[in-house]
Amino acid sequence: VPGYDPANYVTERVWVTARDGVKVPVSLVYRKGFAKNGTAALLQYGYGSYGASMDPGFSVTTVSLLDRGMVYALAHIRGGQEMGRQWYEDGKLLNKRNTFTDFIDVTDALVQQGYAAQDRVAAYGGSAGGLLMGAISNMAPDKYRVILSQVPFVDVVTTMLDASIPLTTNEYDEWGNPE
């Protein structure tokens, strides 16, 4: 990437206490010289499904945002498997709400700790992470200026009720069988 120098960026791992007392890891990246004074814009990403661990990685589009003063946060919420199998179990089926509240609690903590201005927070997720975006838009709409939901999986019950849809029966372990 022309002009990219990794020395210009800082990565950080912080832990946020969720409303039920569980510690949720968050990976952050921002441009060197960033002032943690509560004025920056934040793009927070989440997935939290299928036991998929979301490892931090390089993205040229993220660098463009960092160069404009944004903070990027990857919330390692329950439903993934970053903290082991129980982390996954604690974010699926009847525990799915933990995925959503973890994400919201991460947002609250990052704003409170000065990583972002309360009115400059954007949330992003796709596919099953799109379900997360749908949930937070209903549970905490005032906390996000923008919510981007790519190819969202938002009608879980209807999908799980139709066994003729490809892959539906394979998804029962994640979402349950509503019949």
For each predicted feature, which ranges?
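Non-catalytic accessory segments flanking enzyme active sites
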Residues: 1-38, 52, 56-63, 67-68, ...
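Local beta-strand N-terminus motif with an aromatic residue
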Residues: 40-41, 144
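Active-site-proximal cap/loop segments of hydrolase catalytic domains
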Residues: 74-179
